[in-house]
A protein has these predicted regions:
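Active-site-adjacent structural elements that line small-molecule/cofactor binding pockets in enzymes
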Residues: 1-193
Length: 193
């Protein structure tokens, strides 16, 4: 194929260093001839992070720092960074991506404030929703308000929303509803931890 885009939804700076993310995504961008999008987020599921022996206490702040680092790694020569979580001595990161100024970036969103934040940062919005159309409409409106005042974290604005949802197929409506309710309960319990 020559047109399908490739993406990560989402990579988590709490368990991957931003320079590794930048270099790996640039490599994939080269291999795919400029068809990569980067999804980044904090992870909403503590069970995922417990496998790495980390918690989500500072995950949002780490994402914020990574969002400062990754576009710089892609677009600048030598740079340095001194943050609360990541300290990078002066260096140039290679390879550089094919896409200019850099691959589009998406933010993993699960709450209204992250939809707004994605827009304000000029990032695409990646979300999963078990909500109805009215709630999704409100979340998209919130994103659009953010895009309206965007100060891009990188050097471009990705004005897109991608929302996936669960679908369960089967022959018995009652069993499907019970299974769907159990799955939704599980997802909600993970976000609440």
């Amino acid at each position: 194929t020559s047109r399908i885009r490739l993406g990560i939804a989402v990579t988590v700076p709490r368990v991957q260093h931003p320079l590794h993310i930048a270099a790996r995504m640039a490599t994939l961008d080269i291999w795919s001839k400029g068809r990569v999008d980067l999804g980044i987020g904090r992870s909403g599921y503590p069970y995922q992070m417990s496998a790495f022996g980390v918690d989500l206490a500072n995950a949002t702040e780490m994402v914020d720092e990574a969002l400062e680092i990754i576009p710089r790694a892609w677009t600048e020569g030598e740079f340095s960074y001194n943050g609360k979580f990541f300290n990078i001595p002066a260096r140039e990161v290679h390879p550089k991506p094919v896409q200019t100024p850099h691959p589009p970036m998406w933010l993993g969103c699960s709450r209204e404030e992250t939809f707004r934040k994605a827009g304000e940062l000029g990032m695409g919005c990646l979300a999963m929703s078990a909500s109805g159309p009215d709630r999704v409409t409100q979340l998209i409106k919130t994103y659009r308000e953010g895009i309206g005042v965007a100060n891009p974290v990188g050097k471009l604005i990705k004005d897109r929303v991608s929302i996936s949802t669960l679908a369960i197929c089967g022959e018995n409506r009652k069993n499907i509803q019970e299974r769907g309710a159990a799955i939704l309960d599980w997802y909600r319990s993970q976000q609440a931890l």
